């Protein structure tokens, strides 16, 4: 993705793009006895199980727990730090633009923006340099429309996200090169974006 072109301005999603939740959704849901042990051990499996049982309320509450008090238990995907280091070396600015409400819709009202910011600073990914991510290049958006508007306003040359629907939104800027992050190796063929399976791609 990175070349010698220093006119790049790169944008990254946060959840499931930078942050690797692993089996945390499964672990916390199981701890609360919301799912059986045989449930698929990832975010999608837990979500599909709860929604199939008509318990979208538990799914929403689970997200609040994961993105709030349990966020300290997650780590970045392998290669994220190397990617951002390369951006710092090349003086390529990187923005983190996350679609994340400030408070959960149900359950305890954790400040999810504060939790995510604290995690980012604790992760060592934020540096006060021209390239890479600094404290002034982190944006939390309450809606997908706000997120896409921010991508457009900042005139990002590239954006990485784990959700195809972001790239397929009619408002997504056509000038921005789109990379779908699919670490599970699932390849999505589409003319609007390119799939990558690791940060080394």
Features from the language model and the residues they span:
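Substrate-recognition element of Asp-dependent hydrolases with the DxDx(T/V) motif
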Residues: 71, 80-120, 141
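Structural recognition of alpha->loop->beta junctions
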Residues: 116-139, 192-201
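Asp-based, Mg2+/Mn2+-dependent phosphohydrolase catalytic module
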Residues: 1, 152-153, 158-159, 163-201
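Donor nucleotide-activated moiety binding/catalytic core segment of transferases
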Residues: 131-155
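Active-site neighborhood of HAD-like aspartate-dependent phosphohydrolases
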Residues: 1-58
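Short catalytic/ligand-binding loop motif for oxyanion handling, primarily in non-cytosolic enzymes
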Residues: 19-21, 103-107, 147-149, 167-169, ...
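A structural signal for isolated positions on well-ordered beta-strands in alpha/beta enzyme cores
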Residues: 93-95, 137, 158, 179
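Metal-dependent phosphoesterase signature
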Residues: 36, 43-85
């Amino acid at each position: 993705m990175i070349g010698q072109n220093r006119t790049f301005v790169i944008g990254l999603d946060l959840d499931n793009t930078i942050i690797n939740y692993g089996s945390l959704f499964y672990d916390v849901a199981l701890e609360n006895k919301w799912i059986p042990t045989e449930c698929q051990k990832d975010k999608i499996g837990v979500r599909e199980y709860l929604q199939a049982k008509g318990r979208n309320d538990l799914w929403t509450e689970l997200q609040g727990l994961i993105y709030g008090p349990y966020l300290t238990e997650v780590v970045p995907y392998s290669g994220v730090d190397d990617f951002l280091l390369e951006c710092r070396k090349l003086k390529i600015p990187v923005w983190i633009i996350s679609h994340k409400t400030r408070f959960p819709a149900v359950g305890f009202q954790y400040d999810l923006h504060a939790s995510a910011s604290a995690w980012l600073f604790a992760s060592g990914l934020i540096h006060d340099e021209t390239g890479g991510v600094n404290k002034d290049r982190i944006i939390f958006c309450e809606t997908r429309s706000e997120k896409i508007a921010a991508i457009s306003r900042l005139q990002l040359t590239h954006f990485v996200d784990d959700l195809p629907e972001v790239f397929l939104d009619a408002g997504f800027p056509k000038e921005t090169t789109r990379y779908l992050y699919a670490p599970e190796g699932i390849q999505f063929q589409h003319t609007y974006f390119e799939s990558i399976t690791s940060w080394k791609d």
